[in-house]
Amino acid sequence: MKIATSFIVTGFLCAIVFAAETKVKIEDLPAQVQNTVKEQTKNAKLVGVTKEKEGGKTVYELETMANGKSRDLMIDGAGAIISVEEEVALESLPAAAQSAIQKKVAGGKITKVETVTKGSDVSYEAAYTSKSGKKAEYGVNADGTAHK
């Protein structure tokens, strides 16, 4: 009985994880979200749109590419932009943020750097592969302190 219950719980948790994000066609989006998508993809290629629940509310993630750089936006059901993650060069970050990222990665390889904007809050995120080959991300504020 315990084994059967374990399998049921595991299956349920997997279903929740995989059901959390769903691909969506533009024509199936609410009108306000469609307008934001059109506005934000004028000079970019639309890679994909997904729908998910965050804090009990439906949000949409818009993935775009422009000039070889990724730009992802989180949009609420009213079409307002919640956050933007934009690929940038490490050298474009404030010196303290660059230094903190380089110190954290030490000997590993940075694979992607993004500016993350949520309202007036701006932080920076680096994806990297450690010396041991482990993939990870590290976020910092402009002053180099770790971002939560």
Model-derived segments and spans:
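Amphipathic alpha-helical hairpins
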Residues: 5-6, 51
